[in-house]
Every structure is written in C-alpha cells, then in structure tokens.
C-alpha cells in the first residue's frame, strides 16, 4: 500500500466514488471537508493561568498552529466564573493542516485509544457535521507522557459541506474513519 496524501485521495478517489453513489452531476456538488475544530474546555483555567498556558502549548503541538483562548460569555456565580475569564482553548484547522491532522487522527491517534471499538455513528448533527471527544491528550504522538501534569480531554468537530448525515458519513468512511457497526 502506497501513502497518498488525503487531499489527493479525495480528489482522485473519494470524489468519484461519491458522485457515483449519490448521482451528483457536477464535482462541485460533492461534499468536502471544510474545517476541523479542536476545543479544550479547561474549567480550572479561570483560577490558574498556568494551566491555560500548559495546555495551549500541548494543543499547539497537536494541531500545528497556535490555539485561541476562549473566554466566558457571561458570569456564573456557581462556577465562580466572571465574564471574560479564560475557560478554554480552540483551534480551527483548514486546508493542508486539516488534512495532515486528519491523517494523523485516523492512522495514529484513534488506534492508540484504550478500548477503542470504533467511533459512535450517532455523532452527526443533522447538517453533515461530525463531533466526538477524546478523553486524554496522551494518545497524540507529539505529547510525551513524562511532561503531562494533568490529563485533559478535547472535543473534535469535523465540518463538511454535506447536506445530510448520510452523505457526511459516507464521505468520512471513504477517508477511513472507523465507525462502529450498527
């Protein structure tokens, strides 16, 4: 088996397979990946600025670009959060970085997840976008277990131009996503 970058694979194989299956007349009608958003919600970040900095460095290593600090939209007294306090990090990947991250996710990260039986097929939102979470950042090859002070999970959202969940699922399956059998 030869390594083919995912963007090339999409243009040569996946797009044609999708056109045949769904009967598209034009290649521009075929769903494609738009972006991947990685979000880390860090509740402790409002009290400890160092935690945000540590996880920002980790997320930058994982994604290949600097994350944006997300801030609280409004104050919530029960959580001791004021408006504007840092409560998380997010990265939006597009273009080549998106395809590189997707390749790493499918081939390196998901196989390393403990007790992994496949991705939940119910993670679609009705508009062709897929969301799932990882419970720890240690499954990424860039993160060394010795340097991790605190295990932190993340949410990953894959945004496609697909109109329906069925089209999006087929697109992601052709990219190599390991979904659970229903």
Swiss-Prot record:
GO terms for biological process: translation. SUPFAM superfamilies: RL5-like (SSF55282). The keyword Iron does not apply. One of its GO terms (molecular function) is tRNA binding. GO terms for cellular component: ribonucleoprotein complex; ribosome. Keywords: Ribonucleoprotein, Ribosomal protein, RNA-binding, rRNA-binding, tRNA-binding. InterPro entries: Ribosomal_uL5, Ribosomal_uL5_bac-type, Ribosomal_uL5_C, Ribosomal_uL5_CS, Ribosomal_uL5_dom_sf, Ribosomal_uL5_N. Part of the 50S ribosomal subunit; part of the 5S rRNA/L5/L18/L25 subcomplex. Contacts the 5S rRNA and the P site tRNA. Forms a bridge to the 30S subunit in the 70S ribosome. Belongs to the universal ribosomal protein uL5 family. This is one of the proteins that bind and probably mediate the attachment of the 5S RNA into the large ribosomal subunit, where it forms part of the central protuberance. In the 70S ribosome it contacts protein S13 of the 30S subunit (bridge B1b), connecting the 2 subunits; this bridge is implicated in subunit movement. Contacts the P site tRNA; the 5S rRNA and some of its associated proteins might help stabilize positioning of ribosome-bound tRNAs. This is Large ribosomal subunit protein uL5. It comes from Thermosipho melanesiensis (strain DSM 12029 / CIP 104789 / BI429). The lineage of its organism: Bacteria, Thermotogati, Thermotogota, Thermotogae, Thermotogales.
């Amino acid at each position: 088996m030869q390594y083919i970058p995912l963007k090339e694979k999409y243009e040569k194989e996946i797009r044609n397979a999708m056109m045949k299956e769904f009967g598209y007349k034009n290649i521009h009608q075929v769903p494609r990946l738009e972006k991947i958003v990685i979000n880390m919600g860090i509740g402790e970040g409002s009290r400890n600025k160092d935690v945000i900095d540590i996880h920002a460095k980790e997320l930058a290593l994982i994604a290949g670009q600097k994350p944006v600090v997300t801030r609280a939209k409004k104050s919530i007294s029960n959580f001791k959060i004021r408006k504007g306090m840092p409560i998380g990090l997010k990265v939006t990947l597009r273009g080549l970085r998106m395809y590189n991250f997707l390749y790493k996710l499918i081939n390196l990260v998901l196989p390393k997840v403990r007790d992994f039986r496949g991705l939940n097929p119910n993670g679609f939102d009705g508009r062709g976008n897929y969301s799932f979470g990882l419970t720890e950042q240690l499954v990424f090859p860039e993160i060394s277990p010795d340097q991790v002070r605190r295990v932190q999970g993340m949410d990953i959202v894959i945004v496609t131009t697909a109109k329906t969940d069925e089209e999006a699922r087929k697109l992601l399956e052709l990219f190599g996503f390991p979904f659970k059998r229903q």
